[in-house]
């Protein structure tokens, strides 16, 4: 359990435990708001042979209602947890892990931000989120036995908007800022997302393909289970909303995929969008200085609900706020946090409009709204346009300050209040090379070398990342190796590539492992000898694959974040002990070591950390490496010359990943493990 959460408030537990009726306290004081007006809905939900819902409604709002119903049928558990976090009650279900989210929600004041900005959304968007909330309420009222948290429903359109407000900053590293500050430490200079598991996205134009077809590969890496796992859907409305793709629990529309005209994929980017300020406080820490004024430090009492055994314990905390944003007080002082998109509710508006964009110009106009503060977009369309957009809401920062460090909070010179225009974002559009790609890397590597952007073109105050993953190294190497047109088969071979580039950080780590002094360690010397035979692929063919994957996975997070690498000898020893202890040998076939497991499915799966066929995993009780992230929902979208869009997809498990009794709990796992596709009826 993260220390920052424990340090934050477990000292309050003793007092909280004295409260009577702890087992029912949370439900008794829960006071959900009144529901939005209930309206009749005209919607049908049909499911294809794989259980994927195809939702048709008279209006867009009717479709959103159907999305809620269908998603709840497949995964009410995660929907309930997401909604509980929005209401500040996740801790009542999930204990400490949930209470971390609750504290963050209070600190960022997500619900109040949604309330203040709700009227700024268009009537159509408000109708959409309210219809989605109505669908969740109707499902919950008919399936009360599934509810673990009493008093959560009804939810409202404002709750749906608040969910976007809460989750958005965590996609660009808010957890890596909050954690250290709550522990009394300073955040790392390069915050960014904590997770090394990334995403891939790439597109090939009709001019470069061998059959005049524009192709897009959607390959976002998300956890295979939980509140940000992909769920596939297809939607159609009589108002012209036609889209196939996937979303997260709590989203009233697909977040990526394609319509008839265009599509996009997303990957996480790691630019610097969060600033931390050291406040100048008065003696009792009730005021802070800004320029020549002493201003009151706003304070608000909140109660966290923390499940502990059969009880839900009330834990009081105080959250603080300055003009900069949320404030954390610790033994080092007061630290304010300001992030891109602070106070913004328009993410839902922009995603909804993107779903219905009809051409490249309209899509770009919608992107220029800048309501989605971060995430790369890789784009393709029926007209043959492709592009890589390093989408970010860059603060308009003053020169002369160390924006990666802790900033002085006593001067308005560091308190930015506006953003650079979207046109300032790094982007590569319709390159002559006919391909674009992103794999959580610097935007200066996105296509052929002679058409890539130059780092010098972007001011240091923007905080654009400079790191290149193994996956992007492989994209560049594989595309460079194609002379002439790119066929569909070549594109899929690139997608499922399982190799490591010696020029990548993973390659440099393996080089360090191979130079460990093993003169007095015969077991490690044997392991090194095996690794020297490795062919640098995790395809399950050679005898060294399992050892290589174990060694590379041991530093996956450090490699992804660009952190200093640890000494190699202990990591090599740990990998050797793992394989010897589990199998009694080092040359274990990768298919025996690395598995996909879900219900009765227990299958070999190939690839590794930071390969284009990405498999991230945890060590299971039986010593196997069991996948939990990486390649998951994957979609291939094609616009043939003069023809209608067509697509194929696959999910690591199936349409109903939390319904063990469903035939679609794990029916796609065999397809996924063997790198096969299913059609998407559209």
Where are these regions (language model features)?
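C-terminal/peripheral segments of proteins
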Residues: 2-511, 520, 526, 532-682
